[in-house]
Every structure is written in C-alpha cells, then in structure tokens.
Amino acid sequence: MTLLKDKVVLVNGGSQGVGAAIARAAVREGAKVAVTGRRPEVGEALVAELGEGALYVRADLSDAGQAKAAVGTVVDVYGRVDCLVNSAGLTSRGTLLDTTPELFDAHIAINLKGPFFAMQAAVADMVSRGEPGTVVNIITSSAHGGQPFLAPYVAAKAGLIGLTRNAAHAHRWDRVRINGLNIGWTATEGEDATQRAFHGAEDGWLAEASAKLPMGKLGQPDEIADFVVLLLSERSGVVTGSVIDWDQNVLGGLD
C-alpha cells in the first residue's frame, strides 16, 4: 500500500478514536506518522503499535503555542510536514441559554484555535520548501446547525469550515490542498463515554442506535480513516477547499 509512501503525516488528536484510526491507515499506506495528544500513556502505546519511525508528541492543542510547537517538533525529527490532519475535538454539551463563557472558550480553543495555529505552522513549512502539501480538517455534520445542546461545539466547528475554505483559497497557488470532512455520528470509545455521561445511555445503546440508522450502523473510524488517506494522497487530484459531508443523512432531506 503506497498512497502515502514516504510522506510525513502529523495527526493532531491522533492518539485515540478517529485520529488513531487515521494514524494506522497512514502507516499502512507507507507514511511516517506523528501523533499528538495529552495523555502520554495512550500516545506512547499507539506509537509502539504503529512501529519504528512513529512519533508521539505530547501537546495540549487548546494552547496555540503548543499546537505550533508540535509541528516544529515533527519538522525537527523528520525534516518536514507533508500532511496535516486536525482530528482533536471537544464535544461537551451546552445550549445557547446555559453555556458559560468558560465552556465556550474551551470549545473555541480546541475546535478552532488549535487547528488554526497548527495549520499556520504546517502550511508555513510546506510553503517554505516550495513543495505540495495537504491538510484535512475533521469537522462535523452538526456544523450545519446541529442539536440545541451542541451550541458552542457547532459555533466552533462552523468556524473551522470557514477557515478550511479560506486557507484553501489562500494557498492553492502554493499547491497546498486543504479540505474538510463533516463526519456524522461515529462509533468510538469517546462517543460511548459521551452517551453514558450526557444522555444516560446503558449497555446495548450502540446496537439500538444502529438499528435506527439507514445503513444499520454508526460511522466507523476505519472507514473515515480510509477516506482521509484518499484526501491526503495524490489520488484525490486537485480537489481543495471542499468540505465533504461524510454522513448517512442528507442535508435538506425530510422523512
């Protein structure tokens, strides 16, 4: 498998969930992979699984300085960053009426500021070398509007859609392609914890939820990862500035 042969891929939020699946898929396609995360024991375990040449960088991506420094560490180790994936995210609940300034700021920091400054550093490296590069931002189908209890999350992720398109337009002449993926409801350990913590879900909730969906299942991290690898690779051609709904619901469709 060679879609990303010898490419240096940085996956922010790559130590677990969708990010970890993307890291595994990138390695399978021949990439040298670095992942960031806040929990060393999780990140180091994944890197051991990924094998020789993989790198874990401890970083709190809500801190702009750490987001930029993580890119710098990857450049120091590998000499460059060819591909960046922003997969870190915060999904804590809040409505328009009960969201505190602190919760709002936390969502903006993780879901928008972190990707902004990671892109700033990674794209600067790509441009300085005069080589093509790719960025994929993991966003959410909820950014189209979402549920009432996701107000700060939706605000931040909708901002990431705008940033994705703005940056893609700004750097298309540099041959840096920047795209986004609006993923739908996905079966991860984090989603299981969210359902239990915020919605009182019990054992068996996943099977019940899956049975009510058109495809009979929630989105799968490995499926998302394969799609991200395609977007990162030359196989996706010239596409840039696209924000793709990776979901089994159709925007505007009514039952």
Where are these regions (language model features)?
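Active-site helix of classical SDR
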Residues: 119, 156, 164
